Amino acid sequence: MRIFPLLRVALPLLALASPAAAQNIGESEIIVTGSRISRPNLGSEDAITVDRPPAIGLKRVADFAVQQVTIVGDTRDEKKRREEIFEMARKAIELAGKRGGIELATGQLVVEPLTLANYRNLEIAEDDDREDVEQVSFLVKTRLAAGMDAKAALERIEAFVEAVPAVGRAEMEKAGDLTLSVVGPDKFRAAIVDLVAADAKAMALRLGPAYAVQANGLDRPVEWTRASLTEVYLYVPYSYSVVPAR
């Protein structure tokens, strides 16, 4: 608990505040979309409902730009079609290992590496509109180096996609828009809490000595949303209460 003049921060032991599953998520690489993300596995009795991200949080450049891709095959023979799809996935993994700045992964929320050891676990999806068409999907990502904008990141990813050798009738193509990922959002908790505490202290000073500002919810897990083409906004879903000073 950090105590300031005219400020009370409700802050239980952070290490004990979150379920283990939520803590594990916060230590992983996380996909960040344009929508506010609430962590799974949080009981409703513990949750603080926030319609939109609070005003105080940490905006920073994401760790990776991420693009979903698909490998689509339409060879009539099912066995051959699937072999072509997986062979192209294998070639993509090998090419990523040779080219600098490109990594392959899977996951909708938590990002996991796609490797030669696990690529055949990719789920095969059938095309609802076309017979004898199947596909697999995964992620192509590139680290957002200092000064790199979204256009440069996308161009690097597109160049990689175009460079992957086709196999039979299998083809690789982009799917959807460029998104972002952040590695270990929980490591930014202390910086976020410091920002909230400083804002609460400043608010309390403006209110005068008769009142204090209490910041609630700082024991909640870090949450995230997209802030710009290359930036993420990390925050704790806190709320303020104005109470009589003691």
Feature names for model-found ranges:
Residues 1-10:
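Bacterial N-terminal signal peptides that target proteins for export
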Residues 23-199, 208-246:
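Short, charged, surface-exposed interaction patches
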Residues 17-19:
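N-terminal signal peptide c-region/cleavage motif recognized by signal peptidases
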